[in-house]
């Protein structure tokens, strides 16, 4: 048995392959795709399923399907009989239709082919059916009857049944089944075109002949009906006019439903007139040819409309299509829901990202910011406050979704039973050169002064001292005015402050500052009056001066503990420590050692062999080797722990200062050190802090207002001095950088473009060469390759060990950038007593020097009646006949003015010179 593909089967049936697959599935044939093979016998099984009710579906529109019953087989009579019947009875008028139409039963299938071309042409016009003279029984199928029966008298006819129209059914679009056999036509369409034609009804093109039923129930051929239809009168309406409804009423067909009213209207108005022009055979032939000619353009037009049904762009006229196309191209401004009008940011957001989230062009946001006085670009970061103001103008709300890292790292309060006593942390503070380090040296019984440049402590130190079995942790802070931040930091992490005041010097500025820092931190103060061994020492005067700051000695009725000591002679040191321990006992200092460690970075540096090294003061818990930790924007794992004497230890408890190795970078002094169990959590927190810090810096640098821009334009002559600062420890680098920034003035601006801990490297030299910068090294040296590169590139490297030397040199360098100040220096004056005219030279003033001296090539001004009429220089100076360099007071001389001859007797010539004086900051 031969097989056929589903796609070929669908093409034969004029259907889509999806419809064929669905039909095959209904009859039990398994076919999955269009390329599946099925038996040819399936075609026979498929035919009944295509039209189970014997009805043909004609799609008029995309949603309306008109069902029309198929006609029964008709036995066509002979042509002669047809002619006789046409001559015997003309067409009679149709009675009015009853309001209630009866049901129309289904009929047998009609013959698929027409007999001849004239009959085919008549079939096209057979939708208007002549009214039958006799009633038709609806139950019996139509059979062939004698032609003579058609001549029955009309008076005996029963009442004419009303015209039955097929109801218009609105349903979802379904594939329309087309008859497999269509009448042969000269312009036969292709398979694809056949599918399209089968989906909708084409007015004027009918694929089966329409029957004319006589009174006896017989069916006449379509050609007979075409001859019997009367031709219109002379005043009949034209092709496009509305037809006469009384002449177009079709008779009721027993076996089939009549065409719809819309079809009759189209047919009657457009196709009836051409067929009525001729008579007889010639009329039929001419009518058929005319119908074919006029049917072609209508077919293309209808096909085009049919195709446009499936394309929403082509609905309606071309003008409407263009309008719809232009409307679709326009940007629709939609208002998002309230929940979508909330923008969530983390601290800051860029202008471009904010515009993207609000669905607004970035240029519009930039314009709004310019109106607010901010000059920004699309990549500038906006802080939370600015974002709230800007978003509110466009109807948006902003939520700050920044992660509070303090809440993540915040520890729960310890239970009282878990707390144990801890050693006190004592910070030594005071004015420069009052003996702070000497006192600590005496307490530690170690010489730490030798390492201090110029006797000045330039970084903070942490030491652990044991006295009578009890430990005390000491923090030594600098006393120089530049180290204010260090003193403030030391006051925050300490329990007790020892204020060192020299007995021979009294209260000084840094002493007052230390008192203020201690009071601000709420830390008790123990005053150590040092240098009492000196003959000029006056401790009573010191106590009296301290009373002005609220520190009253206990022997005077106050609450301040004051101890007179001598660091050099080691006098009364134990008494000082006992007072410190007594104060600690009163404070009841306790901590929980059985928890994760938490502390503060006292100092940090970059060691060439060990990497980043941080001095940590543990405040809570116990720090152990191998712990994961996070410090500021850095994280890491504790690789090694060393105490203040350089000994390696495995753990550090509360109030113990240690050096920690293993961090990813050099942290800032004052950062909080937190120990964690999870390395992943430590890295995440460090990453979040880095992002937050970067966003804040971007927002800080991007805030340029119109006023600032105007000031920069106005002060275009401002000089810039760029420096790179490298130091041994982070605290010293911060102090040096801050000291340099304070030197900036309106005339010279100092920019610290880079700062870091460690030796001066090639990277630093490359940066300095690219940015025309000098490098300041504080207690560090350049590498060998860096030194060679600096000499090659011409980069200036300055090395210092004392901070105020670096500040003074940078200040001088800034002064060198300034233009010198011009100062006028008076030389002398001479009175013109005679005027001599010398050819080719001009007028020479015979003058008498009254005051000072006259110098050749000096600047001069000519005064007449004390009014300056000329200012230039002396071109010549002669004494008698000789050219001289100068003429002193009391002598006569000849003076020539450069390019000026309008001199008179009695004028005064005043000589002066311009001196350039270096500008001071």
Swiss-Prot record:
Family indicated by similarity: Belongs to the TRAFAC class translation factor GTPase superfamily. Classic translation factor GTPase family. IF-2 subfamily.
Name the PANTHER family on file: TR-TYPE G DOMAIN-CONTAINING PROTEIN, TRANSLATION INITIATION FACTOR IF-2-RELATED
Q: Give start and end of each tr-type G domain.
A: 421-590
Annotated segments matching region G5 = 566-568
Residue ranges, compositional bias (Pro residues): 96-112
> Under which name does UniProt file this protein?
Translation initiation factor IF-2
Please give the SUPFAM superfamilies that the UniProt record associates with this protein. Initiation factor IF2/eIF5b, domain 3 (SSF52156), P-loop containing nucleoside triphosphate hydrolases (SSF52540), Translation proteins (SSF50447)
Known role:
One of the essential components for the initiation of protein synthesis. Protects formylmethionyl-tRNA from spontaneous hydrolysis and promotes its binding to the 30S ribosomal subunits. Also involved in the hydrolysis of GTP during the formation of the 70S ribosomal complex.
Biased composition regions of type Low complexity, renumbered to the chain? 229-241
Instruction: Report the GO terms under cellular component.
Output: cytosol
List the residue ranges of the region (G4).
530-533
State the residue spans of region: G1: 430-437
* Keywords on record: Cytoplasm, GTP-binding, Initiation factor, Nucleotide-binding, Protein biosynthesis
* A Pfam family per the record: IF2_N
Question: G2: where is this region?
Answer: 455-459
GO molecular function annotation: GTP binding; GTPase activity; translation initiation factor activity
In terms of domain of life, where is this protein from?
Bacteria
Question: What species is given as this protein's source?
Answer: Pelobacter propionicus (strain DSM 2379 / NBRC 103807 / OttBd1)
